[in-house]
Amino acid sequence: MITGFNLSGMTPLEKQRRHDNMAAIHSKNTKPELIVRKYLFAKGFRYRLNHNRLPGHPDIVMRKYRTCIFVNGCFWHGHEGCKAFRIPKTNTDFWENKIACNKQRDHQQRLQLAKMGWHCITIWECELKPRNRMQTLVALEYTLNHIFLCDHSKGYAPFQEYHEMAADQRQTDENVE
């Protein structure tokens, strides 16, 4: 009988090392999330973090804009067409299922948020790489301003078109007298 191995084929030391590696992967305060938060704060936007009463616990919640921002890792959320999203060669069935479930969960949460009247914006990790970062952040700022203006614009009566100019109207009034 071989000692030191469990049924999964890993030694207790390997199992502890894997546990430590997985524990080091954080879901809050990630580098991409901090980049977005720092930019928004510098531009005067105020927000809440990981709102626990909303589906999916959005990374950034902007109540004034009724907008939730999700900063997603390309691998964990299955960013199609991205170089950072590749299914590992080992245990592929597990990873395909895991990522498919993550994508399905993300989709359902965004549908719930939309039904509640929230706008959802997803920013991918690869969009915050140095060469694309500024373009992404400026587009985010533009989108937030657009959302605010659309949601808060007043509905005025449609502009009434006059076919005569004011001077023409005055001349016809003088001719009548």
Model feature map: region roles:
Residues 2-122, 126-177:
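Nucleic-acid endo/exonuclease domains
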